[in-house]
Amino acid sequence: RVPDHAEITTIEGVGTLSDMHPIQVAWMAYGCAQCGFCSPGFIISAKVLLDNNPSPTREEVRDWFNKQRNLCRCTGYKPLIDATMAAAAVMRGEMTKEDLVFKQTGDSIVGTNYIRPSAAQKVTGTWDFGADDALKMPEGTLRLALTQAKVSHANILSIDTTEAESMPGVVRVITAKDIKAAGGTNKINGLVMLPKHNKTDGFERPVLCDEKIFQFGDAIAIVAADTEEHARAAADAVKVEIEELPAYMNAMDAIAPDAADIHPGIPNAFFETNCIKGPDFDWDSIPDSQQVEIESYCSRQPHLHLEPDCGYGYIDEDGMITVHSKSIGIHLHMPMIADGIGVPMENLRLVQNHAGGTFGYKFSPTNEALIGAAVKILERPVSLVFNQFQNITYTGKRSPAFMNIKLAADENGKLLALWGNNYVDHGPYSEFGDLLTMRLSQFTGAGYGINSIRNKSTTVFTNHAWGSAFRAYGSPQSYMGSEIAIDVLAAKMGIDPFDIREMNCYKESEGSTIPTGYPPEVYCEEELFKTARPLYEAAKKRVAEKNAASDGKIKYGIGVSLGVYGCGLDGVDTSNAFAELNPDGTVTMYAAWEDHGQGADMGVLVSSHETLRQAGIRPEQIKLVMNDTKTCPNAGPAGGSRSQVMSGNACRLAAENLVAAMKKEDGTFRTYDEMVAEGLATKYEGNWVTTFCADHPIDQDTAQGDPFATYMYTIFLPEVAVNTETGKVTVEKFTCVADVGTIMNRLLVEGNFYGGLVQGIGLALSEDFEDLNHDTTLKNCGIPYLSLIHISEPT
C-alpha cells in the first residue's frame, strides 16, 4: 500500500519531449522502445535504481528489474540493460545525452542507428494505446463487455438476457439474432487459402455463438452500458443454458476413432498437405545405424503481449463503420468480417491503434467484428477492452504440432531422405490453418539438400484455443521435427552436430534444392557455417572447461541448429504505398504497414528516404500517414516476415515515381509550385509485386514450387547449463550468425533479433498455454524474466 501523502512520480514527471531525462534518451538510442508499452514502467524503475545506485553493475540492473517484476516482450532485455548502463554514465557526468544519440554523417540512413520516429513519444508516455484512446472518447460512448463461454465444447440450448437488460446502465444486450437481423451472416470468413485438400469452406467461426460453443471464452453476447463496470456485471448476468459435450483438447484426441465432429459434417482432420520431393527412398536399403525416427511436440505457445486486446468504434464523418484495433492486417480483416456484420466493404473502415505488441496474434481478427457489429446496431461510439485473463484465454496461440520424423544418411552422414507424419492442432477455427500446415511442407528439413522427402502434415480441429500466427509461423513446429532428428542422427553416427549440418547445407556446387524442389535464391549457408565455425569451437572449449570444473550437478553444453524462413505470402504477393509532395516541400508517405513494435514507422522512413534523398529530402521532412484503410492503399498484412521486402519496396517505388516526376531535364528537381504549374501530379503510387513467383506456383498435391521471393538464414548457437537434479535449463549465452539481407536499420534488426531469441527460449523451456485452470497469467504461462538470458549476441 502506498502511504498517505507519498510523492508519486509517473513517466510524465521524468522528462518531456523538449527536455528528456538521460534514461529516456538512452532508451531511444538503444532501441528499447519497440512497441513502447513497457517503456514507462522500465524507465521509472531505472530512475529509482540510478537515484539510489549511480554505478550499478549489469547484474545489479538485471536483479533490480527482476525484483520490480518489470516485463518486456519485445526487446529480449539486453538493450534495456545497455541503456540503463549508458544513462548511468551520463548521470555520473562521464558523457552527455548528445553522446548517446546517432548523428547522421552522410545523406543516407540505411544501416545506421537512426532512431525510429515514434521513439520520443513512447519514452515520454505521450504515445497513446487503444485503452488510452478509449478513455478520450466523447460523452455518450458505450462500453462493451462480453458474455463468454465457461466450457470448451457445448450445445447452446437457450440464451436469456432478461435480467442483464434490466441492470443499471445497460443500454442493450446484443446476441447473434441481432446481428442477423441487421443483415449480417454472423460468420467470420476464414479465407481458405489452399482449397484442393481442404474439407471446410472457412466459415466455422461465429461472430457470436448461438448454436454451439467451440472453445473456452467464445463470445455469446455483447453488453453495451454506460460504464465498463456496469457492462461486465450485466454480461455475467446473461443466462446461457448448455448441454456440455466432450472437449477434444489436443489433435490426437480429436482424431480418435470415437471422436465426434466439432463442426458437424466437417471431419476434425480437415486439411492435409504432402511434401513429395524427389524419388522414393528404400528405407530398408541402409542399416539401422544410419537412420533415426523421432517424435516431438511443439507447444501451444501464448503470445503474452503485455497490452490486453482492445479497440473501439464509431461512425465517421462519411458514414463509415470505423473500427480501431490492434489489427496487423487491416485490409485483410475487412473481407473477413464485412459480411458477418452486414456492412458492405465500401462502408467499412479499419484503423490500427498504437499496438502494445502482437507478435502475430492480430493476424487473426479478435474484436473487430464484435466492435463493428455493436457500432452498426447501436449507432453510437463504443469501446471494448479486455482484461489480462480474457487476453490470455481468448486470443489465438501458436498451433501445437505433433511431429513424427524419420531421417536417413549415407555412411559419411550425407542426408539421403526424410519422412514425416505430423498433426497440427489448430483449435476450433480453420482460418489460415492450411497456410500454416503448408509451412511444415516448406520448412521441415529446410536448410539441407535432401533429395527424397515424403512428409505428410494434417490440420486438426480441437476445442482448445484457436491457432493464430506467431513469430516464425510454422517453422518452430517444422524444426522441432527435423532439427531434433538431425541431432539424434548425428549422435547415433558419432558425428559432431555442427559438422553434419555444415556437410549437408545448401551448396551451389551440389545443386542443392529446398524442400519444395527449387534452388534457394542465394547460396549463403556455406559462408555462414564458415563464419560460425570459430565461434562454435570457442563455445565447445568454454563448456568443456566448465564441465571439468563442475561437481557434476550442473552440466554445460553447446547446441547448434539451422533456421531458414521465407519472406512473404505464398506465391504472387503484392504491396502498395503512396508518396505525396506537399506545398512546404515535405513528402508524406501513406502506407498500411502495420506496426506491432517491429518498427514499421522506421521501415517506411528509411525505405522511402533512400530514394527521396536524391531530391534533397531529409529524413525529418518525411511525414507518415499509416494504417488506415480510408487513406492508405492495401499493403497486405504485417506478417510472414514480408513487410520490409514487400512494403519496403512499395515505399521505394512510390518514392521513385515521385522523384522521377520531380526531376527536370537538367538534373535539378521541381518544387511543389512548379509541379502544379506544369500540371504534374504531386501524389504517386508504388506497387511491388512478386510476379516471378507466378512461374512456379505451389502444387497443392506435392507442395513443390518456388513460393517466396527471398529467405532468411540463421545458425543458432546456444550455450546452456542443465541442473542434473532438477532438469532446469538456463541459457547462459546465445550467438547467432545470420543472413537477413540488407540491414535497413541496425537498431530494428538487433532489437527484433533479441526479442525473437527470448521468445524462442521461452518456447523451448517455459512458455505454454494448456491448463485453463492454471495458464491464465503471464507468470503462469512461463514468460521469461531477465535472469533466464545472461547475454545474447547476434553476429
Give the ranges of each region predicted by the language model.
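Residues forming anionic-ligand binding surfaces in small-molecule and nucleic-acid pockets
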Residues: 141, 310-317, 450-472, 584-590
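Cofactor-centric catalytic regions
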Residues: 79, 84-142, 181-195, 279-294, ...
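A short glycine-threonine-serine/GTX helix/turn-capping micro-motif
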Residues: 30-37, 466-478, 640
